[in-house]
């Protein structure tokens, strides 16, 4: 990426802002080295990493970087055999702790289902050296002090030191308390000079004290003397301190050697944690700038939605939509200076570089950026002072380099192209340069205040004009980019609002060429048309939003209505099922009553009773599987007793007995009588004409033969069970107390099916397999109620 472009677009300032979000000097170092990538795959990976870090920050608020410091210098010292200091070893322990915590943190999130595949890969790369961390922590505390229990030898030495110091202080304090010594001392304190305990003695009493003078006050009036009585103890103390130093050095050497054995792993952990700090800093920056992850492509297409310049205050910057590389590859922004053209140009260039560096861009969702092989920029008044070149010359030197190095996959930014020379010549050069760049297929944004370029977008393919909106009322630019509308100076309008007489403005307009006036008129018309279109679009969007809201409301109401309807239907089904069950129970009661009557009155045929009950059972509607069929309209014919009708509720034929209400009949269905609503009756035929009754002999129950055994051998399973049910009903009506069911032995499936049916049958009192003389397990003996 061209260094001049990075500098002109102030990419270094973005990096400076980034470093504020790093957790360590390692992260800051990596951020300051940040550069745009030219690889589409790498850019996608970098964007995903930042997006994953953003997810972690949203879920957890932060990542554990505590203890992360730059230990690389200490590791290099360990490699060459230098003894590391306690502070350096503490930093190494801190880094190992950071690696352990980060690994546990990221792997835990991944195991919980958080989508962070890239961050999880980094976590897997971390190498926790728990033993080395434990060894360091057992010898050195968090403040870099070697602990007493670092070794037994050190513990003994420090015990000796404390004992000696205590004895020396006790002896000196007794000297200070002596009444004879009070007048000879400058102060009753114990102090240390040259690492030895001393007391302050007045100069004139020097001869009264034996011992060694180690120092004197600045005035010379006080001498700091080590009394002879404690010289030996001070010597012993001094030797103990030497021993302590040697033991500490030995401990540090051992820890350093252990560290040196793992420098490769430690350097590796440093790099991984540095990269993670780098990634999370970018995610924090994205959050601070309200940036989003852009889609990226290699097609040279850029679409930034409500893009904001990241170096401008968030509450002041004006967002703009910028699109390039689709319908047009070149944008020419025209208009007066100080109109905000350069900000737009820099925004596109800087956001492109940010995206290629793996940074999210300050724009709205749906934004897309391209990965260019080069970004070239000729911006501002960067004169080459060393070469004593003019503004025009310095720009032209840069432009020549751009024309030489650009490709079809480059982004080229020209600010005030052709400025700094004669306007006509500058405009002509600008047009020629733009034609050359456009011919290569590069993506271009150029700003200019030359009116000659206003028509450029109308007579060139893949080129469009643009301008920055100017508010005549406030006499200031709004910084709103207007694509498709060339800019104009607005000099006449501004002058008029500032009080310039109309006649002077009229004279000035008269000096303008007719062609220029036509262009200005065209521009004004375009601006008005664009404003109207934007207003209509805004109104349309509002109507669409209202329609969508109404649609959602209707959908919700329909859904609620459907739920209510389904609930009512379920309740109706339940009530209907309950009524049918009640009717079935009533039928069972009727049959039971008929059995009792049968003992005294044998006029009823048993098989007719069973068939009548079966018809009633089959008439029960299946509410769970199908909806009740639509009822047919009852014939308007007036019903009368004796008419044959169809009971729609059960789908059975019956005979009207008598009318029991305004719209209710008593109906005979087989042997059953029940009350039915007239709306549930369908007329079939009128009652037959009365015939002369014939005497019919009643058929006795015993004339209807029911065998004492039922043979099921060879029957299909379902048919066999159906026969068992019918047989049991027949046997009950026949008055049998006990019957036999022959099912055979076979596979045992039929036998088990019969046994299961008998257990739940209402008329079975008990059942058992046959005895040896009754057929064994191939026969079941059934006792009836």
Swiss-Prot record:
GO MF term set: ATP binding; ATP hydrolysis activity; ATP-dependent DNA damage sensor activity; endonuclease activity; mismatched DNA binding; ribosomal large subunit binding; rRNA binding
Keywords of this entry: ATP-binding, DNA-binding, Endonuclease, Hydrolase, Nuclease, Nucleotide-binding, RNA-binding, rRNA-binding
Enzyme class: hydrolase
InterPro entries on file: DNA_mismatch_repair_MutS_C, DNA_mismatch_repair_MutS_core, DNA_mismatch_repair_MutS_sf, MSSS, MutS, MutS2, P-loop_NTPase, Smr_dom
Residue numbers binding ATP: 335-342
One Pfam family, short name: Smr
Listed NCBIfam families: mutS2
PANTHER family from the UniProt entry: OS10G0509000 PROTEIN, OS10G0509000 PROTEIN-RELATED
Purpose of the protein: Endonuclease that is involved in the suppression of homologous recombination and thus may have a key role in the control of bacterial genetic diversity.
Name this polypeptide is given: Endonuclease MutS2
């Amino acid at each position: 990426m061209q260094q001049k472009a990075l500098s002109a677009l102030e990419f270094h300032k973005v990096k400076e802002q980034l470093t504020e979000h790093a957790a360590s000097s390692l992260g800051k170092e990596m951020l300051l080295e940040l550069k745009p990538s030219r690889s589409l795959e790498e850019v996608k990976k970098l964007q995903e990493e930042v997006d994953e870090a953003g997810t972690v920050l949203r879920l957890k608020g932060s990542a554990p970087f505590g203890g992360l410091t730059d230990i690389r210098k200490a590791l290099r010292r360990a490699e060459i055999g230098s003894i590391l200091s306690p502070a350096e070893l503490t930093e190494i322990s801190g880094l190992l702790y950071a690696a352990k915590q980060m690994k546990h943190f990221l792997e835990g999130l991944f195991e919980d289902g958080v989508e962070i595949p890239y961050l999880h890969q980094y976590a897997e790369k971390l190498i926790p050296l728990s033993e080395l961390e434990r060894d360091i922590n057992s010898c050195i505390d968090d403040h870099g002090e070697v602990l007493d229990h670092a070794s037994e030898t050190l513990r003994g030495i420090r015990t000796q030191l404390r004992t000696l110091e205590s004895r020396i202080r006790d002896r000196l304090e007794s000297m200070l308390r002596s009444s004879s010594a009070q007048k000879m001392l400058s102060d009753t304190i114990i102090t240390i000079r040259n690492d030895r305990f001393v007391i302050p003695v007045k100069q004139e009493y020097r001869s009264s004290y034996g011992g060694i003078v180690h120092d004197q006050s600045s005035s010379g009036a006080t001498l700091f003397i080590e009394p002879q009585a404690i010289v030996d103890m001070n010597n012993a103390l001094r030797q103990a301190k030497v021993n302590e130093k040697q033991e500490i050095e030995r401990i540090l050497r051992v820890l350093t050697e252990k560290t040196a054995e793992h420098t490769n792993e430690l350097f590796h952990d440093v790099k991984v944690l540095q990269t993670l700090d780098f990634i999370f800093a970018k995610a924090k920056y994205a959050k601070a700038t309200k940036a989003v992850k852009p889609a990226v492509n290699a097609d040279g297409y850029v679409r930034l939605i409500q893009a904001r310049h990241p170096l401008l205050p968030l509450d002041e910057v004006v967002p703009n939509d910028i699109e390039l590389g689709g319908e047009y590859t070149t944008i020419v922004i025209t208009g007066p200076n100080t109109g905000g053209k350069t900000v737009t140009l820099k925004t596109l260039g800087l956001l492109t570089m940010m995206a290629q560096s793996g940074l999210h861009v300050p724009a709205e969702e749906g934004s897309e950026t391209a990965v260019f092989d080069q970004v070239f920029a000729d911006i501002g008044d960067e004169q080459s002072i060393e070469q004593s070149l003019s503004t025009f010359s310095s720009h032209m030197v840069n432009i020549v380099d751009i024309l030489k190095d650009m490709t079809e996959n480059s982004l080229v930014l020209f600010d005030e192209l052709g400025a700094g020379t004669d306007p006509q010549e500058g405009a002509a050069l600008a047009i020629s340069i733009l034609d050359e760049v456009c011919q290569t297929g590069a993506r271009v944004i150029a700003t200019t205040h030359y009116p000659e370029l206003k028509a450029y977008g109308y007579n060139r393919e893949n080129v469009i004009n643009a301008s920055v909106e100017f508010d005549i009322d406030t006499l200031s630019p709004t910084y709103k980019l207007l694509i498709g509308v060339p800019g104009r100076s607005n000099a006449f309008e501004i002058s008029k609002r500032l009080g310039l007489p109309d006649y002077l403005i009229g004279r000035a307009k008269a000096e303008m060429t007719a062609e220029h006036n036509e262009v200005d008129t065209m521009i004004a018309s375009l601006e008005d048309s664009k404003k109207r279109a934007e207003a209509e679009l805004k109104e349309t969007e509002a109507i669409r939003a209202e329609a969508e809201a109404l649609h959602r409301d209707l959908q919700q109401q329909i859904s609620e209505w459907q739920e209510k309807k389904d609930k009512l239907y379920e309740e109706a089904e339940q009530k209907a099922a309950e009524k049918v069950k009640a009717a079935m129970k009533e039928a069972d009661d009727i049959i039971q009553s008929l059995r009792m009557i049968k003992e005294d009155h044998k006029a009823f045929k048993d098989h007719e009773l069973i068939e009548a009950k079966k018809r009633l059972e089959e008439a029960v509607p299946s509410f769970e599987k199908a909806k009740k069929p639509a009822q047919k309209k009852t014939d308007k014919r007036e019903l009368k007793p004796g008419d044959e009708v169809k009971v729609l509720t059960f789908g059975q034929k019956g005979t009207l007995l008598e009318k029991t209400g305004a719209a209710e009949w008593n109906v005979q269905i087989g042997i059953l009588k029940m009350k039915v609503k007239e709306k549930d009756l369908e007329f079939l035929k009128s009652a037959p004409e009365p015939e002369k009754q014939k005497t019919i002999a009643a058929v006795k129950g015993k004339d209807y033969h029911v065998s004492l055994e039922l043979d099921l051998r060879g029957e299909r399973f379902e048919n066999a069970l159906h026969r068992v049910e019918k047989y049991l009903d027949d046997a009950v009506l026949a008055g049998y107390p006990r019957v036999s069911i022959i099912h055979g032995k076979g596979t045992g499936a039929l036998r088990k099916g019969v046994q299961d049916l008998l257990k739940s049958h209402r008329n079975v009192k008990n059942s058992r397999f046959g005895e040896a003389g009754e057929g064994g397990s191939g026969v079941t003996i059934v006792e009836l109620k």
